[in-house]
Amino acid sequence: MSQSSTTTEIPQEARDRARSLGWEEGLIEIAIEQGHSLQEIWQALRGGVDGVRARQFLSGGGFVRPDPWWMKVPTEWGIRARAADPALGLSIQDLMVGTYGDVPDVWTNRTEIARGSFPATVGEDMGYTIFDKAIVWADCCVPLYEIAIRDRWISATDLDWASLEPLPAEQEKAVCQLMTELSERAYLEGAILSGWLPAISYGYLELKLFLSTVIYDLARHAETFRKRALANGGGLGLQAPTDYSRTVAESRSFVELMATLFVQDSMLLTLYESGDLIAQNPLEREMYRLCARDRQRYMDYQVERMKHFLFKTPERREEQQLYLNRAEAKLVRDWNDPAVSEPLALLLAGDSRRMDEGHRRLRELRKHQVSAYLANLQRTTITRKTLNGRLQDILNA
């Protein structure tokens, strides 16, 4: 036996692996005597080279290539995805071809397997809990993802912060109080959604991608509102009411969460769309416009998801009414908080000496918000049976 074989310490793990592959005793030592390093031997063992091929290799000096079994999996091959619109480039919609575009009603694999790939013999449970397409899916999430990526904006540079001019103290305080509330609501919703994202199984990849853009949008909104509060001689105001936020955070299922958020999301979209009424300068008008554009995408998903869910599970229609009842009650309670209503009324009035006019305009804005909310519900095929009494009073006023 050569000096190299006697001085090279062969790990027991390597011997055990060799034995499991059918290597005869002493074959590792022979390989070392022929000048092969322990690293090369490990590569052969990890590559699955069995004893017969190892002996052939060492006897003849030829290279034995491990069997490329991974090349033989029966996935759909020969795919050449092409951009439907070359101007927009290759989109995720363009990738939904053949079996790769088949989004099943129930995803049964609990691992990180990519849809369309071939499952390994053994895989670890990755903790997913949402496997039903009806719970999360909306076809619009595919194009909405592309739009979200295309329409992304940067608050630091896309808003002209240098254009801000001092406002009267009471107006600046009203703006900052509103910014405090809106920043908190955006932050909380993004945080809650990000906590649910890992529960959605990999089979609904496109939906997960879209929700990732929503979470990013909400983070940008929280950032932008905070910047506005701190950029013009003001500061943050009183913490926003937490009744509604706690209801959101306590949702026990994705279905409950989406129904609960539907109420606030619709109301906030209408508020942002009405930004010209409360903006005190061009920067704020542009801020509300950009936030409304982001919120519209999310609302489109909310509507289509609910519509798809009710179509697939009509027996759960009445359940949604319960969630909406609870959410509306919490929203009304928040709306009645002076820290929420007074700043809006002052901004709508333009002057604290015209607060009666400001409250009148606020009632008009609230009526518009409730009407738009009910219209969004109608798009999902839901008709509210017992709209919250105070919301009904707003409509009737």
Question: Model segments located where?
Answer:
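Solenoid-like repeat scaffolds
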Residues: S201, L277-I278
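Extended amphipathic alpha-helical segments with heptad-repeat/coiled-coil character used for oligomerization
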Residues: S245-R252, Q264, V303-N325
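Conserved alpha-helical segments that form or flank metal/cofactor-binding pockets of metalloenzymes
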Residues: K133-D151, I215-L238, V303-F309
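Long, hydrophobic, well-ordered secondary-structure blocks that form the structural core
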Residues: E189-A249
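Terminal targeting/low-complexity segments that flank the catalytic cores of oxidoreductases
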Residues: S2-E206, V255, K312-A397
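Alpha-helical transition-metal enzyme core signature, strongest for iron centers
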Residues: L182-G190, L211-A229, M258-L269, Y288-M306
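Beta-strand segments within the central parallel beta-sheet cores of soluble alpha/beta enzyme folds
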Residues: T242, R285-R293, E315-L322
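Short, solvent-exposed positions on alpha-helices
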Residues: L205, L209, P282-E286, D300, ...
